[in-house]
């Protein structure tokens, strides 16, 4: 039998991760969104191949009836979730960043738990004192509130998104860079898109 394709492995990893996280398998639509496949028929095709390999079993009468049949013990398969990577945030001089999903990035499920998260790529050096460097990917938990001092993704009044440390002072919002050479930004109002809960960095 031919080696399982990368896409089939992604789908299998996602199903395993969702069963571990939620206790039930994802729908075909959710699988497609997680691995970047718009066509449900394409997803069904990959599921057919996984079923022929004896890795899953499906009940065609039910939308979520996918049973995992793995030869290896469950603990040998670390749960993986595919995090959407959304646009790009400039740290320093903000640019419009909330665009369509660019890709999905695999992470161990225990990194994010049951949180609703996304990732953004940092472009700039305004957060270097917080250990967030140019080119890093930050892991962001979606939420619309923040406590003083938390690092957030905020949408400004000019519809620009940026990563900064949040402070509410005298009915005014201060977005504070973590770079001694940069000045704070002040706004009457901002929209909180999420709180930064982690950083992913590739060492070249």
Swiss-Prot record:
The reaction(s) this protein catalyses: Hydrolysis of Ala-|-Gly bond in repressor LexA
Q: Which residues carry the site feature described as Cleavage? A: 91-92
Specify the domain of life of the species encoding this protein: Bacteria
Please give the DNA-binding region boundaries: 28-48
Name a single GO biological process: SOS response
The record places the active site at: 126 (for autocatalytic cleavage activity), 164 (for autocatalytic cleavage activity)
Question: What InterPro entries does its record include?
Answer: ArsR-like_HTH, LexA, LexA-like, LexA/Signal_pep-like_sf, LexA_DNA-bd_dom, LexA_repressor, Peptidase_S24_LexA, Peptidase_S24_S26A/B/C
Cite the entry's keywords alphabetically. Answer: Autocatalytic cleavage, DNA damage, DNA repair, DNA replication, DNA-binding, Hydrolase, Repressor, SOS response, Transcription, Transcription regulation
Stated EC number for the protein is 3.4.21.88
The molecular function GO annotations come to: DNA binding; serine-type endopeptidase activity
Show the NCBIfam families listed in the entry.
lexA
Q: How does this chain assemble?
A: Homodimer.
Q: Which family does it belong to?
A: Belongs to the peptidase S24 family.
Tell me the function of this protein. Answer: Represses a number of genes involved in the response to DNA damage (SOS response), including recA and lexA. In the presence of single-stranded DNA, RecA interacts with LexA causing an autocatalytic cleavage which disrupts the DNA-binding part of LexA, leading to derepression of the SOS regulon and eventually DNA repair.
> What protein name does the entry list?
LexA repressor
């Amino acid at each position: 039998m031919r080696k399982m394709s990368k896409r089939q492995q992604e789908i299998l990893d996602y199903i395993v991760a969702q069963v571990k996280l939620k206790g039930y398998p994802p729908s075909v639509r959710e699988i497609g969104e997680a691995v970047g496949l718009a066509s449900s028929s394409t997803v069904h095709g990959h599921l057919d191949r996984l079923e022929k390999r004896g890795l899953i079993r499906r009940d065609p009468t039910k939308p979520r009836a996918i049973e995992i049949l793995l030869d290896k013990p469950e603990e040998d398969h670390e749960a993986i979730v595919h995090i959407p990577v959304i646009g790009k945030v400039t740290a320093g001089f903000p640019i419009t960043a909330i665009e369509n999903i660019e890709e999905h990035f695999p992470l161990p499920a225990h990194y994010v738990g049951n949180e609703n998260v996304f990732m953004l790529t940092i472009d700039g050096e305004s957060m270097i004192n917080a250990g967030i460097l140019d080119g890093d990917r930050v892991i962001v938990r979606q939420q619309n509130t923040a406590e003083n001092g938390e690092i957030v993704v905020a949408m400004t009044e000019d519809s620009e998104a940026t990563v900064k440390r949040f402070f509410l002072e005298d009915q005014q919002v201060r977005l504070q860079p973590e770079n001694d050479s940069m000045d704070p930004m002040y706004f009457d109002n901002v929209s909180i898109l999420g709180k930064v809960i982690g950083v992913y960095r590739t060492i070249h």
